[in-house]
């Protein structure tokens, strides 16, 4: 690894694929990642870049500890893990939204104390606090869609892309919370000490056409 090599942590899966496409549009040759196999670490032939394929929640950890200079990850992860990095760009892919969803008999205007199941306790808590509603948050790591169906919760807060999974489980969206997309984050020291990092970010910024978009 060269001293100015940029290490980028990518969220495995759809965000990874969209990120590679974006980098190709920016003029970078990404063919070395075409045949990944089971590999999780890739270096570009010119040694300018090293890519780490990791799970979404780990992207912020790698960037925070300086193992990665840059991370590409969904805004949902940043909301739950908000410190230790700088958020630089909204990349305008990986588009989806946070929603409140439940069964047909759910009444969002019922003022009784609700139980809300979610994999995103921070966003759920903040949302209902802003509404002035007292709710019990139930953290679930697996398939949250079944929680209202089996009576564990009154409703869920989850990420919705097409809504097909909700429909398949007898749920519908009652409230939209906020839009989510892939974001570029950077290690603070890397931004300060490695000029290649800032040049890379500015090159991507010229394609996506924005600076940091605050969370709404």
Curated annotation (Swiss-Prot):
Pathway: Amino-acid biosynthesis; L-histidine biosynthesis; L-histidine from 5-phospho-alpha-D-ribose 1-diphosphate: step 1/9. It is found in: Cytoplasm. Its EC number is 2.4.2.17. GO terms for molecular function: ATP binding; ATP phosphoribosyltransferase activity. Its main location: cytoplasm. It catalyses: 1-(5-phospho-beta-D-ribosyl)-ATP + diphosphate = 5-phospho-alpha-D-ribose 1-diphosphate + ATP. Pfam families: HisG. One of its GO terms (cellular component) is cytoplasm. InterPro entries: ATP_PRibTrfase_cat, ATP_PRibTrfase_CS, ATP_PRibTrfase_HisG, ATP_PRibTrfase_HisG_short. It comes from the Bacteria. Keywords: Amino-acid biosynthesis, ATP-binding, Cytoplasm, Glycosyltransferase, Histidine biosynthesis, Nucleotide-binding, Transferase. The keyword Transmembrane helix does not apply. GO terms for biological process: L-histidine biosynthetic process. The keyword Lyase does not apply. Belongs to the ATP phosphoribosyltransferase family. Short subfamily. Lacks the C-terminal regulatory region which is replaced by HisZ. PANTHER family: ATP PHOSPHORIBOSYLTRANSFERASE, ATP PHOSPHORIBOSYLTRANSFERASE ATP-PRTASE. Heteromultimer composed of HisG and HisZ subunits. Catalyzes the condensation of ATP and 5-phosphoribose 1-diphosphate to form N'-(5'-phosphoribosyl)-ATP (PR-ATP). Has a crucial role in the pathway because the rate of histidine biosynthesis seems to be controlled primarily by regulation of HisG enzymatic activity. This is ATP phosphoribosyltransferase. It comes from Streptococcus thermophilus (strain ATCC BAA-491 / LMD-9).
